[in-house]
């Protein structure tokens, strides 16, 4: 990774003539970085050179510069894009998502879905439809939460010499790097038991240098969680 972005030269090296699929996510989970149109175009060209599909999970649609966000479906003819109302639209209980793909792949997905699910719940579909019909109001609300809480997290990080991050680009997930002399999983377990703060160990993302921080809780919960995390980190300086 280069600044938490894909190494295009490395991707070229890894792709082979028999490569069938390249998997990415945009925005990144857990980092919160967003791939720009140029990077997506380079990935598409690499995939096109071997006839591979690109599967891109776009469930973390950024709330910053949303209008300028480029979907892989708009860049590459063999893109398979997944999304849902769970993250950016804050409605995980609906359990409703969608796939954008070419006709062949779409037909295969529909056939598979007929065998595994037949249909979604009527109330789930109604809830998801309502959310998308009123998405502007929902996104306006969520932007206030994401931008305000990101500022709170940044201010806290600025006071912590053991913590750093690449600030998420309007995405509701983030990753903080921790300079601590303890295994990340052990630290997270101890933090949960001793202080009631739940973080996802970076090793679960093959990134053992830190933890995933969900910073879009209510302001008082976020501030208290960061305070307790700061106390736990301060113990390493005793």
Task: Give the positions of each predicted feature.
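Conserved core segment of the aminotransferase class I/II
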Residues: 77-147, 154-156, 232
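A generic structural signal for well-ordered alpha-helical segments
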Residues: 47, 157-158, 191-192
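Active-site pre-lysine segment of PLP-dependent enzymes
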Residues: 5-18, 30-53, 58-91
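A short linear hydrophobic-aromatic micro-motif
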Residues: 161-165, 197-202
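Conserved glycine-rich beta-strand-loop-beta hairpin in the small C-terminal domain of fold type I
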Residues: 129, 145-154, 165-178, 209
């Amino acid at each position: 990774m280069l600044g938490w972005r894909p190494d295009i030269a490395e991707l070229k090296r890894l792709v082979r003539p028999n490569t069938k699929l390249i998997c990415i996510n945009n925005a990144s989970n857990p980092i919160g970085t967003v791939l720009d149109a140029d990077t997506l175009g380079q990935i598409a060209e690499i995939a096109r050179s071997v006839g591979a599909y690109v599967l891109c999970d776009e469930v973390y649609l950024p709330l910053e510069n949303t209008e300028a966000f480029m979907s892989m479906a708009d860049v590459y003819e063999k893109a398979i894009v997944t999304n849902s109302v769970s993250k950016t639209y804050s409605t995980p209980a609906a359990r409703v998502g969608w796939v954008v793909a070419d006709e062949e792949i779409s037909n295969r997905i529909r056939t598979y879905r007929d065998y595994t699910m037949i249909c979604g719940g009527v109330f789930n579909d109604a809830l998801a439809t309502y959310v998308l019909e009123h998405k502007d109001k929902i996104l306006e609300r969520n932007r206030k939460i994401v931008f305000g809480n990101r500022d709170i997290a940044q201010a806290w990080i600025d006071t912590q010499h053991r913590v750093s991050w690449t600030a998420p680009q309007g995405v509701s997930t983030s990753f903080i790097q921790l300079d601590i002399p303890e295994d990340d999983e052990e630290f997270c377990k101890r933090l949960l038991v001793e202080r009631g703060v739940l973080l996802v160990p970076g090793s679960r993302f093959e990134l053992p240098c830190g933890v995933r921080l969900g910073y879009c809780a209510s302001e008082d919960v976020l501030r208290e969680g960061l305070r307790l995390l700061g106390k736990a980190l301060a113990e390493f300086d005793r």
